[in-house]
Amino acid sequence: MKAISVLGSTGSIGTQTLAIVEDFPDQFRVVALSAGRNLSLLVSQIQRHRPDVVALADQALLAELKDRLMALPADTRPEPLPHLVGGPEGLDVVASWDSADLVVTGIVGCAGLLPTLAAIRAGKDLAVANKETLIAAGPVVLPELKKSGSRLLPADSEHSAIFQCLQGTPWSDTARLSTGVPTPGLRRIQLTASGGAFRDWSAADLEKATVADATSHPNWSMGKKITVDSASLMNKGLEVIEAHYLFGLDYDHIEIVIHPQSIIHSMVELADSSVLAQLGWPDMKLPILYCMSWPSRLETPWRRLDLTEVGQLSFRAPDPAKYPCMDLAYAAGRAGGTMPAVLNAANEEAVAQFLEEKIHFLDIPKMIEGACEQHKPDLAANPCLDDVLAVDQWARQAVREQVNRGTRLRGASMAA
């Protein structure tokens, strides 16, 4: 039985991970959980899974969590109560919990970086749904992986598809991820993208895009931030950078293809020009399960793919004019160093500002480009962890300042 630690247990990835544990009680058990502020859901997860340790990102909520657990009926209250920890140190405890065999990282954004590093330094294998860890800190993470022997297993559908395709090659032993060197025999990666909420919109129509529009994904059920990233295609741009670090390919050999049906999750072209693809319904539980069961596969009762039901699979090239975030991501990846960290942080902040309706959808790439341009003179080619954390905070502030300037300008214009 494999012992699982879940970072971000109340989020989309975390809840799906725990659902898998419930589907396979003879294969997995939960030993550690971390969460943000959703105490009601967390309490129910503790009741059901009885972990050894639980961490809250906000240490101030620990007393309330303990009170809620103590108030449970005696027949449903875990005995003994889990060890409760809080703050960044608490997240590190969950990430490096001694009995955990696999750490599932479902914390959204750069907030997942430090606990992911803690897990790596503890020698844990990781199921990585937090793509920002490699994007922002690839030059920091790869040496730590080499030092500890940890393995990163991709829990997002696209990189899981690539990983699964490579398991069928003679060099699959070298495709265990995150060595930072090219995977032998791998010529090209094609990352498929649904096109997001605006795939059937014209570039001109995006002027009137609302938050509700951007957070309505046609195929996948995801959190708001990543759904907006899908609408802007930034999610795919970030995945290009992640694929570069995971599989060692140059950016010129990692392509994005719009595939509206979201049935092919990605493709690899091998040295002999063969192309391998992984197919399945758009369901995040499949790549998460593969991470959890790897190198084995578990039989599931889940819905099986019927291509006659799908009818057709279509593909088209993405329009750079409609998706400017895509080119920004390629440029940041090629610049390397601290630039991907700036790109990632600026995007996180710009999306947050959009979700609060402080900026328009088309302002998101403008804010990101502004931060990246400002950072060019200060780019660190070989960053350490402190460099990454510093530029992360700087980029967020740079976006906030752009938003504030724009607000003041709009206010002055209206007054005139």
Curated annotation (Swiss-Prot):
Gene that specifies this protein: dxr
Broad EC category: oxidoreductase
Keywords on record: Isoprene biosynthesis, Manganese, Metal-binding, NADP, Oxidoreductase
Chain's role: Catalyzes the NADPH-dependent rearrangement and reduction of 1-deoxy-D-xylulose-5-phosphate (DXP) to 2-C-methyl-D-erythritol 4-phosphate (MEP).
Documented EC number(s): 1.1.1.267
Residues involved in NADPH binding: 10-13, 36-38, 130, 132, 223
Family as reported in the entry's similarity comment: Belongs to the DXR family.
Cofactor section: Mg(2+); Mn(2+)
Catalytic activity: 2-C-methyl-D-erythritol 4-phosphate + NADP(+) = 1-deoxy-D-xylulose 5-phosphate + NADPH + H(+)
Molecular function per GO: 1-deoxy-D-xylulose-5-phosphate reductoisomerase activity; manganese ion binding; NADPH binding
Matches recorded under InterPro entries: DXP_reductoisomerase, DXP_reductoisomerase_C, DXP_reductoisomerase_N, DXPR_C, DXPR_C_sf, NAD(P)-bd_dom_sf
Chain residues that bind 1-deoxy-D-xylulose 5-phosphate: 131, 157-158, 194, 217, 230, 235-236, 239
Pfam families: DXP_redisom_C, DXP_reductoisom, DXPR_C
Single GO biological process annotation from the record: isopentenyl diphosphate biosynthetic process, methylerythritol 4-phosphate pathway involved in terpenoid biosynthetic process
Domain of life: Bacteria
Annotated Mn(2+) binding sites: 156, 158, 239
Recorded metabolic or biological pathway in which this protein acts: Isoprenoid biosynthesis; isopentenyl diphosphate biosynthesis via DXP pathway; isopentenyl diphosphate from 1-deoxy-D-xylulose 5-phosphate: step 1/6
Protein name: 1-deoxy-D-xylulose 5-phosphate reductoisomerase
